[in-house]
């Protein structure tokens, strides 16, 4: 009975890395994608349109981050998404971070672009150390 327990534990140790939700390959692919997003987002509209993809990458990365990193980025996201309004009205429906609208006032556009740039910088720093 003792050897079968040891064999089961050994098998679990071999299988457990395969069950992890965010592999090193996924992390590397997301790291490259962050670089592509930041490099390709040259104008304000492309930055605003890419914000949701940055947030999606952050959500995938979230479980593997330290508590300090998670709190830092969560605080930033919550502070800025609460402040985003379109034509003086808070956005409605779905997640607060979906800030894309067909008509965005210049002030909201500037805020959204700044949010994209800061979020991209914070997430990129997670990959570079």
Swiss-Prot record:
Keyword Phosphoprotein: no
Signal peptide: 1-21
Family that this chain belongs to: Belongs to the Turandot family.
UniProt-annotated location(s): Secreted
Name of the molecule in the record: Protein Turandot A1
GO biological process, one term: response to oxidative stress
InterPro entries registered for this protein in UniProt: Turandot
Function in brief: A humoral factor that plays a role in stress tolerance; gives increased resistance to the lethal effects of bacterial challenge and stress. Regulated by the JAK/STAT pathway and NF-KB-like Relish pathway in the fat body, upd3 in the hemocytes and Mekk1 in response to septic injury and consequent immune response.
The organism of origin for this protein: Drosophila simulans (Fruit fly)
């Amino acid at each position: 009975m003792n050897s079968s327990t040891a064999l089961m534990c050994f098998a679990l140790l071999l299988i457990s890395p395969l069950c992890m939700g965010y592999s090193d390959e996924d992390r590397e692919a997301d790291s490259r994608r962050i670089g592509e997003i930041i490099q390709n987002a040259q104008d304000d509209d492309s930055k605003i349109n890419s914000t949701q993809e940055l947030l999606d990458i952050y959500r995938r990365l979230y479980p593997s981050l330290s508590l300090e990193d998670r709190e830092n980025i969560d605080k930033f996201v919550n502070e800025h998404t609460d402040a985003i309004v379109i034509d003086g009205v808070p956005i409605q429906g779905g997640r607060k971070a979906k800030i894309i609208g067909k008509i965005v006032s210049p002030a909201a556009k500037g805020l959204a672009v700044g949010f994209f740039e800061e979020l991209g910088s914070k997430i990129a720093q997670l990959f570079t150390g």
